[in-house]
Amino acid sequence: MRQTKTGILLANLGTPDAPTPEAVKRYLKQFLSDRRVVDTSRLLWWPLLRGVILPLRSPRVAKLYASVWMEGGSPLMVYSRQQQQALAQRLPETPVALGMSYGSPSLESAVNELLAEHVDHIVVLPLYPQFSCSTVGAVWDELARILARKRSIPGISFIRDYADNHDYINALANSVRASFAKHGEPDLLLLSYHGIPQRYADEGDDYPQRCRTTTRELASALGMAPEKVMMTFQSRFGREPWLMPYTDETLKMLGEKGVGHIQVMCPGFAADCLETLEEIAEQNREVFLGAGGKKYEYIPALNATPEHIEMMANLVAAYR
């Protein structure tokens, strides 16, 4: 029987190549052109995107990226590369490639990198713990487009999500415990997930249920009372309703009600990025403290910590 050679493809959203208006514009154009992200009529969306959104948002977003940019690139790219390298060290006989839905390195370059290693089976791990059509679905779509152009197609194992994976929950719980040990136990642990339009959930995207699953399992692992753990949604865009409650509005309300000490974790982000380091760690800190809160701490993403890499290795083991 012929032995199968397996490769692993780590997939994430992507990032601009530089914290400049031009680079951000290229990235946002690709990102916001995906129907999985924005499914508005193209006749309405194209003029709005190209004539209003890209010219106005790109310079402002570039400044935000510049505020968190690292020596090796954007935080998402730096931590994603660290994850790829650490997993490759953990699994020395298995090629590991990194691909992004938008920007570089592309998913196509990652597939080609693995095929150049003569793999005939690829385990695809989208680094989105909670499934959504707008994230995991986008990886699936692009992978199908890539393989449709190939004469020979490798076997594919596609990991839909890992919202209640035991190792994932334990890694989150240990990260929370470390933060509590360092900063003291807060009045409230707030778990902020990236939002999606409410309409997507109404049409069948089970993302909110998967977020609730992670929240429930994490609270149980920590032994925390339900009233001391709250789930919210961040990063809304546009005018239509998104999943609620909104993170920023909730933090303002909690500060005004006299909640003194909050710690915030973003379980849906496998690596720190603009949305965690700038929006949550900085903008929302100002919202909470400005509303009367006394102490606010952001708990970093799992990034390339040993526990996170071990979780990835265990997760893909069943498919190798």
From Swiss-Prot:
Record: residues binding Fe cation: 194, 275
Enzyme Commission number(s) of this protein: 4.98.1.1
Alphabetized UniProt keyword annotations: Cytoplasm, Heme biosynthesis, Iron, Lyase, Metal-binding, Porphyrin biosynthesis
Superkingdom classification of source: Bacteria
Catalytic EC class: lyase
Any one GO biological process: heme biosynthetic process
GO CC annotations, alphabetized: cytoplasm
Compartments (UniProt record): Cytoplasm
Keyword Nuclease: no
PROSITE patterns given in the database record: FERROCHELATASE
Gene Ontology molecular-function annotations: ferrochelatase activity; metal ion binding
Pathway: Porphyrin-containing compound metabolism; protoheme biosynthesis; protoheme from protoporphyrin-IX: step 1/1
Family annotation (SUPFAM superfamilies): Chelatase
Gene3D superfamilies noted in UniProt: 3.40.50.1400
InterPro entries: Ferrochelatase, Ferrochelatase_AS, Ferrochelatase_C, Ferrochelatase_N
Residue runs in coiled coils: none
Reaction equation(s) it catalyzes: heme b + 2 H(+) = protoporphyrin IX + Fe(2+)
Main location: cytoplasm
One Pfam family matching this protein: Ferrochelatase
Family: Belongs to the ferrochelatase family.
HAMAP family xref list: Ferrochelatase (MF_00323)
Its job: Catalyzes the ferrous insertion into protoporphyrin IX.
Subunit structure: Monomer.
Protein name listed in UniProt: Ferrochelatase
